[in-house]
From Swiss-Prot:
Keywords, comma-separated and alphabetical: Elongation factor, Mitochondrion, Protein biosynthesis, Transit peptide
Protein name: Elongation factor Ts, mitochondrial
Organism: Caenorhabditis elegans
Coiled coil: none
Any one of the GO BP annotations: mitochondrial translational elongation
PANTHER family from the UniProt entry: ELONGATION FACTOR TS, ELONGATION FACTOR TS, MITOCHONDRIAL
């Protein structure tokens, strides 16, 4: 019985040595893998123990495969949770635009960089998918709806897989409620804006977005970009329901301000009657100058709008 003691001690020593060897993961390697992949320190440590610090490629591959499994499992587990927060994005490139609505459970996640990166990724994949799309003739925006499973990111990953990985990382249920693209007729430029301005440097994001198809025959006193930004903000703030037609101008003396010395025999001025309850965009009082209609403001800058889109987070 006593003869077996050295063997028992040997097993104990061997197990302790193995455990100590497993713990020998350098802080530098752990931080490098964490920075490269974005996965948790716990999983990065597991990968380094399994493959060693000299085989980072295998460690990264293992992490991605593990994350995919965890992400799909977590996505299924969290799938019934309500997603009442999130952001809507709008990204444009000349005559093509993408509008994506991504929802999550909390405002905290909606404001995170990881959430915005995911929304940017989806938005850019929609834009890339839509750019070569041909459209029929007409003067209105043409709309296309895509399934997330038909989209890939710049690395060729299916966007459904990308979404599941993000759910696994962020630990919240997320749903993509709107995946749309818009194309304008040739020669027309699309512009977009958001409110509040919660997006990235490249992509406007917010609770509200608007998109307009703008033509400008010649440069006005402000740039097309600035003009479009003003109209987009008007659309977000005033919630027009249709484009409509320009209101008829009438000759009237009522448009003249009453002032001392005014000649009552002077020619009447041309004014536009503006209804404060108007829901057609072109006939609404322009938000930045209520004495003008939107149509009049556009006309003063040699511009016109062919169509527009307004989206609010959670709307149908």
């Amino acid at each position: 019985m006593f003869a077996r003691a050295p063997f028992v001690r040997l097993l104990s020593t061997t197990s302790r040595n193995l455990a100590e060897a497993e713990k020998k993961v350098s802080k530098e390697a752990l931080m490098a893998l964490r920075k490269k992949t974005g996965y948790s320190y716990v999983n990065c440590r597991k990968a380094l123990i399994q493959f060693g610090e000299n085989d980072m490629d295998s460690a990264v591959k293992w992490l991605k495969e593990a994350a995919a499994k965890e992400g799909w499992a977590k996505a299924a587990k969290l799938g019934t949770r309500v997603t009442s927060n999130g952001l809507v994005s709008v990204v444009t490139d000349n005559s093509t635009a993408a509008v994506v609505e991504l929802s999550c459970e909390t405002d905290f996640v909606a404001r995170s960089g990881a959430f915005k990166d995911l929304l940017s990724n989806i938005s850019n994949s929609v834009l890339a998918k839509a750019k070569p799309q041909s459209i029929s003739s007409g003067s209105k925006l043409q709309e296309f709806t895509y399934d997330l499973g038909d989209l890939t990111d710049s690395d060729g990953k299916n966007m459904r897989e990308v979404l599941s990985l993000s759910i696994g990382k962020l630990g919240e249920n997320m749903t993509v409620r709107r995946v749309k693209a818009f194309k304008a007729p040739e020669g027309t430029t699309l512009f977009g804006a958001s409110h509040p301005k919660d997006g990235t440097d490249d992509i406007p994001m917010g609770r509200f977005i608007s998109l307009i198809a703008l033509n400008q025959s010649s440069p006005g006193s402000i740039s097309s970009q600035q003009l479009a930004g003003q109209i987009c903000q008007h659309i977000i703030g005033m919630s027009p329901e249709s484009l409509g037609e320009a209101a008829e101008s009438v000759k009237t003396q009522e448009g003249l301000r009453s002032q001392e010395g005014h000649d009552p025999n002077a020619d009447p001025v041309v004014v536009t009657n503006i209804d404060e309850s108007e829901t057609a965009l072109l006939r609404q009082a322009f938000m930045l100058n209520p004495s003008q209609s939107v149509h009049e403001y556009l006309k003063s800058h040699n511009a016109n709008i062919l169509d527009f889109v307004r989206v609010e987070l959670g709307s149908e």
